[in-house]
Amino acid sequence: MVLLPWTPPYDWAWMVGFLQARAVAGVERFHDGGYSRSFGVEGHRGLIHLAPDEEAQGLRVTLSPGLQPVAEICYARIGQLFDLACDPRQVARTLGDLAQARPGQRLPGALDAFEQAVRAVLGQLVSVAMAARLTAKVAAGWGEPLAESPGYVLFPTPEALSRADPQALKALGMPLRRAEALIHLARAALSGELPLTAPADIDAGLRQLQTLPGIGRWTANYFALRGWQAKDIFLPDDYLIKQRFPGMTPAAIARYARRWQPMRSYALLHIWYTDDWAPAAE
């Protein structure tokens, strides 16, 4: 068991709520205050188990034997998923009053960028719960069962999804164009067209993402937010954001949000999850 530290405060309850609402059955489980999931990387596979240790200020992590040879990679990915490197004091200084209600809120990332890209595409125009159910069906159909852990499957690899029949994906309950977009996404991951690590120029990376079929502006930005854990993403034309800024155009909202650079991703999450928030009069 290893302790991966965080800088307090850390709002574990909020993070669990966010991730649990999007949990993919068969891949991940929340239980007894902790989290378990299947994971595969560099030919190794196994289970990750973790739980918060509030007294020690960190996550207690246990890896199954299959993941021990890639333990450092696993720890780094866990750090990305749970945003353990975040300095909440810096966020508070940048966001000011916006961060006061939830000073320990973090930016949920991803263990695997390709997985997050698939989730982002499957989340288009459906509820969070429906997206999670649909993703679980894809995982069950194209993910490899984890033999040593009955009931768990590995999230499908790009290789597996690149060979999928679009009609079989459509039969799970998605439009044919979305099924075809998933297959293209998998092939783009294999060819390098889909950047799986954050590029030096995030804006250029976002433009590249939007050249892929089925990836529009919202999906590209949401993927960057979580798959790349980009810290300065804002969505001025997001439905909920527009509700929080009544009477303002997306251009005006974008101008307002400049005050939170270079941490607009954190501002976005705070605004999404603060029902009574309203912009200051200017």
Spell out what each predicted region is.
Residues M1-E282:
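HhH-family (HhH-GPD) DNA N-glycosylase catalytic core used in base-excision repair
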